[in-house]
């Protein structure tokens, strides 16, 4: 399937598809979550012995509750230490000793190797894919920021938005459900739920083919097409604004 000329949106859909394939392949093979790898990458490249927890929350787009849980795991395995400020106990800091930094460096090197090996096997031709852990971190945060933009300005999930982008890119605006599932790189139940939500809100039409009832068609009428194009243009403009760019490391 070809996407339309909304370049920024197309880039993010490509990145999201890459991340989906990466997580699916790598997750069963490593003894650490991707988020924990990313957190260690962040701490390693900060090159600070002590970091306020508030700064980590500000820099990374993860939920604070998620970060708390992952930090607990890293503390448990002695990658980092957690200390409270003597001045104000409400302020928490992450502390890293030289020994811990060496241990973190080994994990970051492993993450670099995992990314390179996956890229070699994946054979993606996109220039957007990350070459190492630092680029992976930036792209992950950028895509999460993108999802926040969609949720805030359009009140749509990323899956719902991706479906709209794919359908509007088709010449006749007709997509088979089977083809959509193969293209979107999200789990089947999640995709079907998003489709049903879009149909309920009047964004698209979902119906069985009159020629073959086993086939489910997804398409839009002219008004729905115009509305979707306006939404895509709005998001593309937001993404084109460099003030909205969220990169942890330049």
Swiss-Prot record:
One of its GO terms (molecular function) is DNA binding. Induction: Expressed at the early exponential growth phase, decreases through exponential phase and reaches a steady-state level at post-exponential phase. Repressed by MgrA and SarA. Activated by Rot and SarT. Transcription is also dependent on SigA and SigB factors. Is activated by SigB in strains harboring an intact sigB operon (rsbU, rsbV, rsbW, and sigB). InterPro entries: HTH_MarR-typ, MarR/SlyA-like, SarA/Rot_dom, Transc_reg_Sar_Rot_HTH, WH-like_DNA-bd_sf, WH_DNA-bd_sf. It comes from the Bacteria. Keywords: Activator, Cytoplasm, DNA-binding, Repeat, Repressor, Transcription, Transcription regulation, Virulence. Residues 53-76, 177-200 bind DNA. GO terms for cellular component: cytoplasm. Pfam families: Staph_reg_Sar_Rot (PF22381). It is found in: Cytoplasm. One of its GO terms (biological process) is regulation of DNA-templated transcription. Transcriptional regulator that controls expression of some virulence factors in a cell density-dependent manner. Acts as an activator of the gene encoding protein A (spa). Negatively regulates the expression of alpha-hemolysin (hla). Mutational analysis of the spa promoter suggests that SarS might stimulate spa transcription by competing with SarA. The regulatory events observed in strain NCTC 8325 are not representative of the events that occur in clinical isolates of S.aureus. NCBIfam families: Staph_reg_Sar. Belongs to the SarA family. PANTHER family: ORGANIC HYDROPEROXIDE RESISTANCE TRANSCRIPTIONAL REGULATOR (PTHR33164:SF5), TRANSCRIPTIONAL REGULATOR, MARR FAMILY (PTHR33164). This is HTH-type transcriptional regulator SarS. It comes from Staphylococcus aureus (strain NCTC 8325 / PS 47). The lineage of its organism: Bacteria, Bacillati, Bacillota, Bacilli, Bacillales. The gene is sarS.
């Amino acid at each position: 399937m070809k996407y339309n000329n909304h370049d920024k949106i197309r880039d993010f859909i490509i990145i999201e598809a890459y991340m989906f394939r990466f997580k699916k392949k790598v997750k069963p093979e490593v003894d650490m979550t991707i988020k924990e790898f990313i957190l260690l990458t962040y701490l390693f490249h900060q090159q600070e012995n002590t970091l306020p927890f508030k700064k980590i929350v500000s820099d990374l787009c993860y939920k604070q509750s998620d970060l708390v849980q992952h930090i607990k795991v890293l503390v448990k395995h002695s990658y980092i230490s957690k200390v409270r400020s003597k001045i104000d106990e409400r302020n928490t800091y992450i502390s890293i000793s030289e020994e811990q930094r060496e241990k973190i460096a080994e994990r970051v090197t492993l993450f670099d190797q995992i990314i390179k090996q996956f890229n070699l096997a994946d054979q993606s031709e996109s220039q957007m894919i990350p070459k190492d852990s630092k680029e992976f971190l930036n792209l992950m945060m950028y895509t999460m920021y993108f999802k926040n933009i969609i949720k805030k300005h359009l009140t749509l999930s990323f899956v719902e938005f991706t479906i709209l982008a794919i359908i509007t890119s088709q010449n006749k605006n007709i997509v088979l459900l089977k083809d959509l599932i193969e293209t979107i790189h999200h789990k089947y139940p999640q995709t079907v739920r998003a489709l049903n939500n879009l149909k309920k809100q009047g964004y698209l039409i979902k119906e069985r083919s009159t020629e073959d009832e086993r086939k489910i068609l997804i398409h839009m009428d002219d008004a729905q097409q115009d509305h979707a194009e306006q939404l895509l243009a709005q998001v593309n403009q937001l993404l084109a604004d460099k003030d909205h760019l969220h990169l942890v490391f330049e």
